[in-house]
Amino acid sequence: MAIPLLSDPVTSTLSAADRATGLPVSAERALVRRAPRERLRHLARVRRNKAVARSLMNRFGWRSAAQYRCLERLWTHESHWNERAHSPSGAHGIPQARPGAKMAAAGPHWRSSARTQIRWGLRYIRARYATPCTAWTHWQSANWY
């Protein structure tokens, strides 16, 4: 007569979620501990990018809070203010320029520099829509700008 095992020594050390993901418990815990720090870094980067945009908007003559709110909404929808954002269609950066290389006209570090991307995006908005609110209005009706 075989004696049944009370528990499998390998699977008993893994939670159901760990077994589903295939990650060892220690790796899962490390991800959970790291997540808040990465979130804080992301939020700090977003705040910094928005501050850069606010500063540059003044140079374009867009000083009103309304124009800033329009730009904030527009680029939140486009990229969540992430300078590393990349869409499947090939759009890149905070303003989601397509192709991303168009932003090279604003500076050599267009792939990674939020300031370069924001400068290019504000120039694009001025040339095509005149103001961030006009660009936002277009985005609301067409889901692109």
Predicted regions: what they are:
Residues 1-69, 134, 140-145:
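Intrinsically disordered, low-complexity
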Residues 46-145:
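Peptidoglycan cell-wall recognition and remodeling modules
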